[in-house]
């Protein structure tokens, strides 16, 4: 039985284009006790491969975290495959606000120690004792309460392009660093405040709220379904939208437009912009914000150095990449030497 991708991303993209295939981008997560992650992973790969599901899925003893792209014509088959797994049979699917047929180009299901890399030792507190989930309307009400401390549980590059009004946006690279920010807020504001948290789809707030409960905080709240579900409820129920800008997403779209506000700037020229791009130089692949003008001037590169590298032959570029590991390279303003140049 084939348990890995037979097609490259480029081949898959071509097939999607040729078939004019309409696909739905969605995500879900679930914390539950999984005895055999390997068996579960292989089962999912077989079932989902047969209905052309693509995406990035993490499986661990603690559950599943999935971001997927499903052919519209197969969405009922996909839902049936989920319903046949007891812990997942009533799970909410976070449907993307904007659909892009090539949001994912491979089906990747990986076994991990955890479904979110949180750096926590769960033996020190009960992860099932979490905060109260709020829908969009109640979240808005809590956000307006002067006794509320709202914390964005995402990383700096996510909150840079979009956030809730009045939220604390930690300048962090990891979830574990966000918890250190929570500790500082507790020390500064005390335990009697309302602590309100949000993230993309809700998964990071689950453990963060359990962490706060462990710290002895009574008034702990989290946004049900994250920014994705919040926006759906706002649109369907004609509620006030308190989110400014884009919601960063971890697929080829890089973001969903929530409001018309542009709250960030091009990392090269400083003009208003909220479009992330990976440097086209494969030996770099830096994630940063680049406007249309700079993209044209810089040939989708992050630096003059990378512009020179992409002029080399394929073999020369491949030789430069040998032995280098470039995953998770993300620009952080003031910390990256790559972007210390000025476009005239």
Give the predicted meaning of each segment.
Residues 131-145:
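Internal catalytic-core helix/loop-beta-alpha segment
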């Amino acid at each position: 039985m084939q348990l890995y991708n037979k097609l490259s991303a480029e081949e898959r993209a071509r097939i999607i284009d040729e078939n004019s295939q309409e696909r739905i981008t969605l995500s879900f997560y679930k914390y539950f006790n999984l005895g055999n992650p390997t068996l579960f992973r292989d089962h999912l790969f077989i079932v989902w491969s047969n209905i052309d599901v693509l995406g990035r899925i993490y499986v661990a003893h603690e559950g599943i975290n999935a971001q997927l792209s499903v052919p519209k014509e197969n969405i009922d088959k996909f839902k049936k495959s989920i319903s046949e797994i007891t812990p997942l049979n009533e799970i909410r699917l976070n449907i993307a606000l904007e659909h892009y047929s090539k949001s994912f180009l491979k089906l990747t299901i990986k076994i991990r120690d955890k479904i979110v890399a949180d750096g926590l030792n769960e033996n020190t507190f009960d992860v099932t004792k979490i905060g109260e989930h709020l829908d969009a309307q109640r979240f808005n009400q809590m956000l307006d309460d002067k006794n509320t401390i709202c914390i964005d549980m995402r990383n700096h590059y996510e909150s840079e392009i979009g956030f809730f009004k009045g939220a604390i946006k930690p300048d962090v690279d990891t979830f574990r660093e966000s918890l250190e920010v929570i500790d500082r807020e507790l020390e500064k504001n005390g335990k009697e405040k309302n602590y309100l948290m949000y993230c993309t789809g809700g998964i990071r707030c689950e453990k963060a709220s359990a962490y706060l409960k462990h710290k002895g905080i009574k008034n702990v709240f989290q946004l049900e379904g994250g920014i994705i579900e919040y926006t759906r409820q706002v649109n369907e129920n004609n509620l006030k939208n308190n989110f400014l800008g884009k919601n960063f997403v971890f697929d080829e779209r890089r973001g969903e437009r929530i409001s018309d506000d542009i709250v960030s700037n091009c990392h090269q020229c400083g003009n208003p912009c909220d479009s992330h791009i990976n440097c086209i130089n494969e030996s770099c692949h830096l994630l940063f914000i680049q406007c249309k003008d700079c993209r044209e001037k810089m040939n989708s590169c992050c630096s003059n150095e990378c512009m020179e590298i992409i002029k080399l032959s394929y073999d020369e570029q491949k030789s430069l990449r040998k032995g280098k590991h470039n995953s998770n390279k993300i620009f952080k303003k003031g910390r990256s030497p790559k972007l210390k140049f000025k476009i005239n």
